[in-house]
Structure formats: C-alpha cells, structure tokens
Amino acid sequence: MAAIELIDLKKNYGPVSAVKGINLTVADGEMIVLVGPSGCGKSTLLRMIAGLEAISSGHLRIAGSDVGHVDPADRNIAMVFQNYALYPHMTVRQNLEYGLKNRRVARGEIERRIANAASILEIGEFLERRPRQLSGGQRQRVAMGRAIVRDPAAFLFDEPLSNLDAKLRVQMRVEIRRLQRQLKTTSLYVTHDQLEAMTLADRLVVMNGGRIEQIGTPIEVYRRPETVFVAGFIGSPPMNLIDLDQLGPCQLALPRDTDVIGIRPSAINLGSGSAHDLRFDAFVELIETVGDENNVHLRIDGADKRVVASISTNQPLQEGDRISCHVGMDGLHPFNRATGRRTD
C-alpha cells in the first residue's frame, strides 16, 4: 500500500490541454473516485497514473518515489478495465497466474496468491473454466482477482461496471467496496455514474474540463457544492439552478453578489410556508413516479423557468394543478453566475 501524489499534473495533445494542472493526494488505503462527464479528463488522468499516457508536465509520486517516467510494469499498480481484458484462450487460473509467471514469481507463491484471491472473490469453482463460460459479473471478479494476485501498491479502476446490467452493477459495487475495505489498498476509481461515485468513495474528486471542481466526502459534496457545475452534476434529479431575476420581487437575505440560487428537488415543499421562505406558485406539467416519491416537473408561475420537486406519492397531485411551494433558507445554495462559485 502507498500514498499517491499528483503535483501540477498536465497532459497536452498538441495545442489541446486535456488535463490542466491537477494537484491531489490519495492517502494510504484511501478510495478516491474521479467523477465527471465524458471528456472531463478523468480517464486520461487515470491512464497517466498507470503509465499508459505520457505526462506532459508535473510530478507523479507513489510511496514517495517519482514514477512519472517509470515504465508501467515497474510502478507496482494494478488496473481493472471496463472490458475485463481477459485472455479468452486461457482458463481463469491461467489468467490469474500469467503476469506472475512473467515476473518469475515462485510456483508456491503463485499458488498461494491464487488461492487467496479465489477465496476473497468466491471464484474457486471457476478456476478451470474459460472466460466465455462465465457471466459478466464472474468475468469482472476474475479481472479483480488478476489485480489482487499482483499484491500492488494501488488499484486503478477504469469504469469497471459499465458493461454490466443495472442489478449486477449494484451487486458488484458492493463487492468492490467490501474488497477495498478488506484489503485496505490505495485505490483510484473512474466513473461517470454519480450513484456509483457516491456509494464507493471515501472522497470524491469532481472533474470538469480537465480541472478539479471540488474534492470532498460524498456527503460534503452533496450538501455543499462549491460551484454551479457541481451543483448541477451531483444529485439525481439534479439541483435546480434559478436566476434570481426569474423569480420576480422577493425579500431574501442572501450573500452579496448572489444572482443564482440552487435548490435540491427534495427541499421544495408544498404550501405557502413562512415570510422568511422563498415562496412561489407553479403549474404541474409532468409527474414521474419513482418508488415512494414523485419527481414533479413544475413551471414557475409568471416565469419561463421549470424546476423539479421530489414530493411524496402520498400528496394528491395531478398534472395541470396549480400549487403553492416554499423553500426554507437552509435549502437555498447561493452562487454567482460570473464566477461560477458559491457566495457564502
């Protein structure tokens, strides 16, 4: 196990800057999840750490050693890919032992590591099968097993669950988190799926346009997004972002330079509320039922602005209703549009 340090790490493709000066420290044994939309630079950054992409400038340290120009095989890290990357003509056992044989690990040690990985991942009964005889989830377990037997300083996960169906993704997500906590191996995990990110991470790193927007625990990032981008990206349904001038005259005690407020759908309540609340009337345009809640799509009365509210299915609402809504001051997130940042 080892800490990973990224110091002003940059990646350029000719005149295009894909990764723009990343500074990040992953503590020994920590699980960091890089999350962001397609093209934000998260996978490029992971490949730079793995050694699959050259670093344009900056420093990469693993366990205190600068490895930015060290061959990938010598960085003592293991990577788990989206497409499993298993050899189809080999059995599971042969896939697990292949890298160890190439590094001339002793036969007894190879057997010990394979037995340990098979026990942890519950794949012992599959050791003599070939990948085509396994389900998607079983293949992903084998891919993780191949990483475990290397006994690396760190794991790198590149969207490993993207090829699985929804039910299996949930199951494998739990298994990856359990495995990481059991092994206490420093881990970096890349995903565009915010639910995956929120449930797996010790800390989230939200990326956008090759830069870090915010670093924090999942609950910190959710409860206090530092930028307009993070506010609109983290959360499902996403946070409603409303320009103050779309609300008309209102008496709210907001920080100076606030011209945008963010409101979580769960913070919108039915009824007129109190004089200190943000209050508005709205028309119900669409109701989406998702379990115990409805995602209610509203058009604010007198404004060309639509918002989404998460309302209990016990509330008798119908499309076409005109309703009164309120949001307490603790449910308002103040931002400045020009800077893109919080004002409080």
UniProtKB/Swiss-Prot annotation:
Q: Report the PROSITE patterns cross-referenced here.
A: ABC_TRANSPORTER_1, ABC_TRANSPORTER_2, UGPC
Q: Give the reactions, separated by semicolons, that this protein catalyses.
A: sn-glycerol 3-phosphate(out) + ATP + H2O = sn-glycerol 3-phosphate(in) + ADP + phosphate + H(+)
User: What would be one Gene Ontology cellular-component term for the protein?
Assistant: ATP-binding cassette (ABC) transporter complex, substrate-binding subunit-containing
Q: Which UniProt keywords apply?
A: ATP-binding, Cell inner membrane, Cell membrane, Membrane, Nucleotide-binding, Plasmid, Sugar transport, Translocase, Transport
A Pfam match is TOBE_2
Q: Which residues form the ABC transporter domain?
A: 4-234
Q: How does it sit in the membrane?
A: Peripheral membrane protein
Q: Does the keyword Translocase apply?
A: yes
Q: Any keyword ATP-binding?
A: yes
Q: Which residues bind ATP?
A: 36-43
**EC number(s) from the headed UniProt entry:** 7.6.2.10
Q: Name one GO molecular function term.
A: ATP hydrolysis activity
- At the top level of its lineage, which domain of life is listed? Bacteria
Q: Subcellular localization, per the record?
A: Cell inner membrane
> Where this protein primarily resides, as one coarse class?
membrane
InterPro entries, per database record: AAA+_ATPase, ABC_transporter-like_ATP-bd, ABC_transporter-like_CS, ABC_transpr_MalK-like, ABC_transpr_MalK/UgpC-like, Mo/tungstate-bd_C_term_dom, NA-bd_OB-fold, P-loop_NTPase
The enzyme's first-digit EC class, named in words, is translocase
UniProt similarity note: Belongs to the ABC transporter superfamily. sn-glycerol-3-phosphate importer (TC 3.A.1.1.3) family.
Purpose: Part of the ABC transporter complex UgpBAEC involved in sn-glycerol-3-phosphate (G3P) import. Responsible for energy coupling to the transport system.
Subunit-structure text: The complex is composed of two ATP-binding proteins (UgpC), two transmembrane proteins (UgpA and UgpE) and a solute-binding protein (UgpB).
Fetch the PANTHER family from UniProt: MALTODEXTRIN IMPORT ATP-BINDING PROTEIN MSMX (PTHR43875), SN-GLYCEROL-3-PHOSPHATE IMPORT ATP-BINDING PROTEIN UGPC (PTHR43875:SF12)
Q: What is this protein called?
A: sn-glycerol-3-phosphate import ATP-binding protein UgpC 2
